[in-house]
Amino acid sequence: MSNALASKKKVSKNQVVFFDYRDERKLKRFINDQGKIIPRRITGLSAKEQSLLTHSIKWARFLAIIPYVADEYK
């Protein structure tokens, strides 16, 4: 019996994943409507990729490229 989450998981094999902190559209794909970073079990990223993504999102927030929280939650 297969796990439902395992079948939905995206697998990034042999792909070089680079998250640029200046790419607002790409980073917003990994942030929910409240402004929280989507967890790894949902995004399907590896631990290293999720770490790079988190670092890029936090750096973009620090530089005010993306907001810390959504406007409706301020």
Swiss-Prot record:
InterPro entries hit by this protein: Ribosomal_bS18, Ribosomal_bS18_sf
Assigned keywords, A-Z: Ribonucleoprotein, Ribosomal protein, RNA-binding, rRNA-binding
Entry protein name: Small ribosomal subunit protein bS18
Domain of life the protein comes from: Bacteria
Subunit structure: Part of the 30S ribosomal subunit. Forms a tight heterodimer with protein bS6.
Similarity section: Belongs to the bacterial ribosomal protein bS18 family.
Keyword RNA-binding annotated: yes
GN (gene name): rpsR
Swiss-Prot/TrEMBL GO biological process terms: translation
A GO molecular-function annotation: small ribosomal subunit rRNA binding
GO CC list: cytosolic small ribosomal subunit
UniProt xrefs under HAMAP family: Ribosomal_bS18
Primary role: Binds as a heterodimer with protein bS6 to the central domain of the 16S rRNA, where it helps stabilize the platform of the 30S subunit.
Listed Pfam families: Ribosomal_S18 (PF01084)
Originating organism: Chlorobaculum tepidum (strain ATCC 49652 / DSM 12025 / NBRC 103806 / TLS)
UniProt key word Ribosomal protein: yes
